[in-house]
């Protein structure tokens, strides 16, 4: 999917409205606990201000539900951004209105302003045309660099593009499109997808779309037990989606018909309770005792999955292999992250979907060893499902 980007336009002397994803975690004192998302936007910010653009940034923060919630003000973000850039960032009192417009018009070349939380207005999430037009009136160029919200048709991601031209992708979105797009449309083979997570229901569309593209699918996470039940295996107390057993059977049959190498675990780590102190044991699939549940993939599965990953040329990973937040059940996920980093060091293109898999890679300290970690959980999932993302579709081709 080719979209015009910051490289295709001149920003000098123009007011540039850029949608960023500054939805950062705050503690109870409104201190930012992780500024990764702010740092990720810096390449696009630097480019615009170095080119002499007058930059107006906009973002949401949290879920204020269309009301002004002072604890969700973007003021701490403006402060952190000014520290990172070593330059002052004007903080607007609102994202629309006369005062914000006057502040925008007063900007000089290379100056930056951050609008207040977009979601203080209910019209943002409703993609209200009048609200989108008012946002658009502040700028002469629109840039979207918020991949994390690209799957939402909101006023600041989709509606705004109808009222300001050019509308282009920032570097972050350009990078997402490059890696995710290449994996889905023109992958180097063998192409392996690793899917984890608790529920099949959240991954049906991804599986069905990837069946048209991949050579091998490795399945982990609690959703394996619904597949095992479909195969008539005993699963003990493990999590099963009973209403999806028939669907699991259908997916197994589809993989077989299309000659896709779909690998389920051969052993799991079982425990009697969901706790860090629980006694654990590795058991073969189908051999989970009635009073126990599977909470991670086992050592034999780790070996098999790692071999598949190391033999691949392209790997896409979405979803953890077990309950990685609890130490005894994190080994499978961490081992897969390690195999992915080892494969990448040998030239494999590795792409990690946002959310839990990204968190696992960070936890393992392996982020720098991965080709691309997506910045959008929901957006990368919808991209892998083959869906159009409204915030991307609206940009200039």
UniProtKB/Swiss-Prot annotation:
PROSITE patterns: PGLYCERATE_KINASE. The keyword Ribonucleoprotein does not apply. It catalyses: (2R)-3-phosphoglycerate + ATP = (2R)-3-phospho-glyceroyl phosphate + ADP. Keywords: ATP-binding, Cytoplasm, Glycolysis, Kinase, Nucleotide-binding, Transferase. It is an enzyme of class 2 (transferase). One of its GO terms (cellular component) is cytosol. GO terms for molecular function: ADP binding; ATP binding; phosphoglycerate kinase activity. It is found in: Cytoplasm. Monomer. Belongs to the phosphoglycerate kinase family. This is Phosphoglycerate kinase. It comes from Chlorobium phaeobacteroides (strain BS1).
């Amino acid at each position: 999917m080719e979209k015009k980007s910051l490289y295709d336009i001149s920003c000098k002397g123009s007011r540039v409205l850029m949608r960023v994803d500054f939805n950062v975690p705050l503690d109870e004192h409104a201190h930012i606990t992780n500024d990764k998302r702010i740092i990720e936007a810096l390449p696009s910010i630097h480019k615009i201000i170095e080119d002499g653009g007058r930059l107006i940034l906009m973002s949401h923060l949290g879920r204020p539900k269309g009301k002004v919630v002072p604890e969700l003000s973007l003021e701490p973000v403006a402060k952190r951004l000014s520290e990172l850039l070593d330059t002052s960032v004007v903080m607007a009192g609102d994202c629309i209105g006369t005062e914000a417009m006057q502040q925008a018009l007063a900007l000089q070349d290379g100056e930056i302003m951050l609008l207040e939380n977009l979601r203080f207005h209910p019209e943002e999430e409703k993609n209200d045309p009048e609200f989108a037009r008012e946002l658009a009136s502040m700028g002469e160029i629109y840039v979207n660099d918020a991949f994390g919200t690209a799957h939402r048709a909101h006023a600041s991601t989709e509606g705004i593009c109808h009222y300001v031209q050019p509308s282009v992708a920032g570097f972050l979105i350009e990078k997402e499109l490059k890696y995710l797009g290449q994996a889905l449309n023109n992958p180097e083979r063998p192409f392996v997808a690793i899917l984890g997570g608790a529920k099949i229901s959240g991954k049906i569309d991804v599986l069905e779309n990837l069946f048209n593209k991949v050579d091998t699918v490795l399945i982990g996470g609690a959703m394996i037990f619904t597949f095992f039940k479909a195969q008539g295996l005993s699963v003990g107390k493990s999590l099963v989606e009973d209403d999806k057993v028939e669907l699991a059977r259908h997916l197994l049959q589809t993989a077989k018909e299309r000659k896709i190498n779909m690998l389920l675990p051969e052993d799991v780590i079982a425990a009697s309770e969901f706790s860090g102190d629980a006694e654990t044991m590795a058991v073969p699939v189908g051999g989970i005792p009635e009073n126990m549940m599977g909470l991670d993939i086992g050592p034999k599965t780790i070996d098999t999955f790692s071999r598949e990953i190391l033999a691949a040329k392209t790997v896409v990973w979405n979803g953890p292999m077990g309950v990685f937040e609890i130490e005894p059940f994190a080994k499978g996920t961490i081992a897969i992250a390690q195999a992915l980093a080892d494969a990448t060091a040998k030239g494999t293109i590795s792409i990690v979907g946002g959310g839990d898999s990204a968190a696992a890679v960070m936890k393992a300290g392996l982020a720098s060893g991965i080709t691309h970690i997506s910045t959008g959980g929901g957006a990368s999932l919808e991209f892998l499902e083959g869906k159009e993302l409204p915030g991307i579709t609206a940009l200039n081709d």
